[in-house]
């Protein structure tokens, strides 16, 4: 039985392709920029991801991406959930702080804020969404049960961040993005949400003193009672936004194209 690209095994091969893509991007960038500054790091990340996305689309033999109209309320409710999720994960961020290697990368990026902005806020959301939702999840939705594909693709999305501090949030957000992609049949909502999430993170990086970059929200507030109230409110926000998102919007959208079928073919 023919299947859509990619299957789980084909995704593993695609991740192996990512390794030489990194090496190629380093060789291309080194003559013009150091890999220790923001411009060099940004260029290497962008080129390696672009090469991987190109390989994925070529192997799929279909360069089209899903684009459909969707209610803007989906963006608003999803942003509320993301805010609530980040607050709910704050205690775990205290237990698993960002590694020093990641802090060094952030410092290098912020030395060239314009390059960092283009990489973090513009290119990363587009390229990562095309790879993880437009290619990987799109294949999973056609080959496997929807929620199985969403969870596996979210795990891979978390894994590529390379550390537990970012991975926890990336997994939760990856599930949200995958759910929205499945129901809306469009890659645009997840790209917009990724833009917003990364833009907020970028502003936080710029405005936070270097010595405080690993501080949790609770440590910034320095008031356990106030943080407890905020934490309780974030539960209400996260649960409420997801409930409304499901009941009023996503549950009413057609998912016919994402259901597993007996026979699947690849467009050529």
Which positions does each model-derived feature cover?
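N-terminal membrane topogenic signal
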Residues: 1-15, 225-229
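Alpha-helical transmembrane segments
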Residues: 7-22, 74-85, 152, 235
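Hydrophobic residues within alpha-helical transmembrane segments
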Residues: 13, 123, 152-156, 168, ...
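Juxtamembrane helix-loop-helix connectors linking adjacent transmembrane helices
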Residues: 36-39, 61-126, 130, 138, ...
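C-terminal membrane module of polytopic membrane proteins
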Residues: 197-268
């Amino acid at each position: 039985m023919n299947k859509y690209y990619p299957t789980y095994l084909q995704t593993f091969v695609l991740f192996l392709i990512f390794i030489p893509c990194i090496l190629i991007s380093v060789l291309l960038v080194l003559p013009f920029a150091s890999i220790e500054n923001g411009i060099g790091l940004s260029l290497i990340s962008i080129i390696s991801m672009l090469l991987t996305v190109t390989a994925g689309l070529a192997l799929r033999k279909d360069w089209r991406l899903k684009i459909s109209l969707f209610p803007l309320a989906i963006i608003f409710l999803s942003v509320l959930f993301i805010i609530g999720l980040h607050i709910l994960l704050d205690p775990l961020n205290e237990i698993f702080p960002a590694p020093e290697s990641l802090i060094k990368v952030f410092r290098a990026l912020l030395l060239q804020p314009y390059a960092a902005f283009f990489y973090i806020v513009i290119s990363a959301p587009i390229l990562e969404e095309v790879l993880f939702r437009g290619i990987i999840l799109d294949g999973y939705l056609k080959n496997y049960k929807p929620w199985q594909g969403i969870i596996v693709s979210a795990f891979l999305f978390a894994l590529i961040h390379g550390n537990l501090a970012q991975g926890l949030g990336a997994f939760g957000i990856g599930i949200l993005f995958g759910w929205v992609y499945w129901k809306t049949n469009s890659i645009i909502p997840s790209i917009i949400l990724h833009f917003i999430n990364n833009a907020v993170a970028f502003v936080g990086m710029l405005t936070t003193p270097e010595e405080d970059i690993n501080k949790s929200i609770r440590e910034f507030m320095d008031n356990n009672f106030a943080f407890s109230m905020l934490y309780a409110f974030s539960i209400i926000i996260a649960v409420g936004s997801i409930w409304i998102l499901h009941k009023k919007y996503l549950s009413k959208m057609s998912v016919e194209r994402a259901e597993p079928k007996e026979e699947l073919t690849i467009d050529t």
